[in-house]
Amino acid sequence: FKELIDLANKHPRVNILQPGTGVGGHCIAVDPWFIVSEFEKETIIIRNAREINNYKTDWVIEKIKSTALQFELDNNRKPIIALLGLAFKPDIDDLRESPALQVAETLLAENKYDLLLVEPNLEQSDKYDLSDYEKLNGDADIVAYLVAHKEFKAFETETIELDFCGVKS
């Protein structure tokens, strides 16, 4: 999919953005629903777009779960999964309506996975036990990039990497 975006972006008037874990934040993820609620028939495309964007988060969750299952089958143990990035967009500390946070909360709620949550733009969290990405040092068996924070571009690991935000491209 990335190759198609790169090819299309060679055209001078095209700028397709890198898809991420989903659409988040306190505006874009929420405001369209106000319009849809008032003009239901006229806003079918807006409703469909939001539903598709919301589905992307579910797809990411399933991809992480299937990778974890394959790791477990191959190694006879559960993997440690590092989820890198919890904010709703790169290089901020705002978790409001964050699809990356939804991924983390869904996996935490299932209580089946050993998770390391990493958000370099937050020093601490009252709700989450955050790990320092610089100290992962091979602790994780699977690294899932959920948000393209600048810190993650140079992060190197020998483990399985799932890049959902284009930080490694």
Indicate residue ranges for each PLM-predicted region.
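Structural/interface elements that position substrates and couple domains in central-metabolism enzymes
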Residues: F1-S169
